[in-house]
Amino acid sequence: MNFYARTTAVVLLGIFINQPIWAQTFKMSCELEGVIPALEDRKLKPEKVVVEIQTMGKNLFMKVVGTNFYTVQASSLTTEEFIGKNLTSEKLMGVTRKHKATGFESEVRIERETVMMTAFNDMDYRGKTVRVLLSGPCIRP
């Protein structure tokens, strides 16, 4: 093998080895209703959202994709910023995380049998920490 062929092979091998490995994302639609108990049980307009579920190694990642109040992200991964925990059991799949600096928590749970989702997300609302509670049925794809 000449120098050019070896160099090309090494460069191509390096490109393929350094590509990030992404887990396949499972998506599911849900019809959620939200409430903010700290604001006199203020009800939010119901919304259709998409729940994205991924696993990477032993970690579970769940993300509710919707508008401002209907966006929740949690994972079992523990990092410098977050403490994560896998809540998955025979009855449900879920994760929770807590931001170390702010104490804000978020959680997503989906009941296996009924495919009902419950979630919450702490957020700052006009200088006050409030918890947005979400719940509703999901549709299996």
Language-model features, listed with the residues they occupy:
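Sec/Tat signal peptide C-region and signal peptidase I cleavage site
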Residues: 19-23
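Edge beta-strand at a domain terminus
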Residues: 121-141
